[in-house]
Amino acid sequence: MAGSADFDLYRPSEEHDMLRDAIRSLAEAKIAPHAAAVDEEARFPQEALDALVANDLHAVHVPESYGGAGADALATVLVIEEVARVCASSSLIPAVNKLGSLPVILSGSEELKKKYLGPLAKGDAMFSYCLSEPDAGSDAAGMKTKAVRDGDFWVLNGVKRWITNAGVSEYYTVMAVTDPTKRSKGISAFVVEKSDEGVSFGAPEKKLGIKGSPTREVYLDNVRIPADRMIGEEGTGFATAMKTLDHTRITIAAQALGIAQGALDYAKGYVKERKQFGKPIADFQGIQFMLADMAMKIEAARQLTYAAAAKSERGDSDLTFQGAAAKCFASDVAMEVTTDAVQLLGGYGYTRDYPVERMMRDAKITQIYEGTNQVQRIVMARNLP
């Protein structure tokens, strides 16, 4: 019946709405003021990390049994979305903490969970995820990093590339070949610590966007780790990696969604103030049509992303398709919306005095990492509902 206030199918819960309000207030007060400097100086957003840790928002996905908030997948999406709305680099703190630690949550032993999830939940450590290599990007199963058993230890050698927050994170989930004759079924997952002998990092990449989040190579030179740091059974690492991405592609959708919303919000305010021909440019129909299209695309991306988050939380059988769809669609929307935001500001939008050019640069990576959007379409085609 029309008018029923209890029909919640397409509405987040009151608790989720309250969480969004709290994160937005925090992000605007503690993170937004530093976003331009973080980008300009290409420095890690320490202020954001401090604020997120102080409010237990840096890794809300960690289960309560390991000291975390035990937040659901939609709550994690809201945290990332609202932080990305003001600073995309900062949103990679909660996003990559989930990406790096989810293999442990999904497949790790109880001992591994207790050892590594507790410090993450407390804010004493961050997690990164090491899958890609110089010659193994979209073809991740073609990796060359090797792990060789030596008694009660594994010895790792290889190079991982494009590792987000490398050098800042204390813990790294590393995929390595343990049986080269089995291709993807010969890959295993391990937890490597920054302090392990033989671990080192390359120089930060000089990137178009997300400049505050360091992206580096991780070098593994005879890194000797205890055998109990293997995540799951030998040979299951690639399966764990792919299962992880089913869930975490949604966090990239959330990041893209936040970037797009931030760009729309800024452009909307600008066109109401900017006057030409004696009136605000918001009064011109051409401008209104652009804003309408931007808002429409964002809302469609939001519904797809939130629905995918719900499927992640439930573990629905079509999660692989829905996660890829959310990431692909939301990131394309982010690129379109931020480009339009720059256009709405005209020459001002093209300068660093205004945030929309940064948002446009930040948006581009969401179409690339955790699988390019071309790969997402392959994933979707192979998993059509």
Map each language-model feature to its residues.
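Short Gly/Pro-enriched turn/cap motifs at secondary-structure boundaries
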Residues: 95, 135-138, 162-165, 179-181, ...
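Short glycine/proline-enriched turns and hinge-like loops at secondary-structure junctions
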Residues: 71-72, 139-141, 165-170, 183-186, ...
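Flexible, small-/acidic-enriched active-site or ligand-binding loops
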Residues: 142, 195-226
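Alpha-helical interface subdomain recognition
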Residues: 1-90, 107-112, 119, 123, ...
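Helix-loop "lid/cap" segments that line or gate small-molecule binding pockets
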Residues: 98-107
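A short, Trp-centered hydrophobic/proline-enriched beta-strand micro-motif
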Residues: 123-131, 175
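A short core secondary-structure module
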Residues: 153, 157-201
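Short, surface-exposed charged micro-motifs
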Residues: 144-146
